[in-house]
Amino acid sequence: MKSLIAIPLTVFLFAGSAQAYGPRGHGLVGAVADKRLAQNKPAAAAVKQLLEGLTLERVATLPDEIKAFDACGKRPSTKPLKVPKRVNDELMAFLAANPCSGHPSHHEFHYTDVPVLGGEKYAGGKVGRSDFDIVHMIPFCVRVLNGEEPETNDRGITKTVAVILLAHYLGDIHQPLHVGAEYFDADGNPFEPTTDDPGLADQGGNKLTLFTLVKGKEKSAGKLHSYWDGQTVENAFGTLKTSTIASRLSKNEPENWELAGEPDTWAEQMANEILPVAREAHDRLDFKRIKEKAGEQDITSGRAEERRQSGGTFYAIWAAATVKEEIHKGGWRLAALLEASLQ
């Protein structure tokens, strides 16, 4: 295996929010896969036909775009997506089959919340998992593509929608906070939940405000989850164009990217692989001012403060290097998954 390629790690140690992993991070995963898939003409032709000429880079952001179409508690949008009519119609049918107000909701398909405390693997417990989380939905899409699951399924996932979802979910499952979550007891202390005592979840970091160290001082970096979705990508790749990054990443084989077994087993392998990273993403932080509300299953707010380490790597630098590696693997794995599923 070759080592990660020499794209400069451009880390700016400042606070701030950026675009979500969707627009740039997801696009990068798709763009790398586009380059890789181009080397397999039959698979590339099949994907092109299903997507009516759209690239994986483009469609990788669509699942987040339709999340915004029916944001919970708001009136669903009827505005068509900027995609071919058939693709739009199939995505809208998928949306209707899995509405925000229903169960399952397509919002649930993007993540799983395995507790980071305790060393569990995905199959080692039940807290934070569901039959409709990302570890279940990736193989569902694989089965649609290989014909094991009919396109007339209850989830409204056609082969076209399956490709679109996989282009996105392969990015999500390589983002550590889409797989691992912190849980707290009634006193606001991290703890290992059980089915009898599930505690209070942090929604994959969505309820925690991150404070990183900048020149020795704490500065707010926004919500912990959003930081990993967006700022880490900007820190990792700076102002380099997507085409430049994708070209370099697609030509250099990432370390330890290949997975064993059938494609419908890969999601659980990827989840188990990213869980130690999710644990470190939390272990590097101290949690303070954790607040809860009676009757709620999640915390309402809290602080996640970077720990001061003598001679250690800053959180921002470590996170950016991690995201660069995960996007690299995600792109190669997306191409391999589509090739294997469309044989």
Enumerate the predicted regions with their spans.
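Hydrophobic core
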Residues: 9-13
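Sec-dependent signal peptide recognition
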Residues: 1-8
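N-terminal, motif-rich segments that launch catalysis or mediate targeting to/interaction with membranes
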Residues: 19-167, 176-343
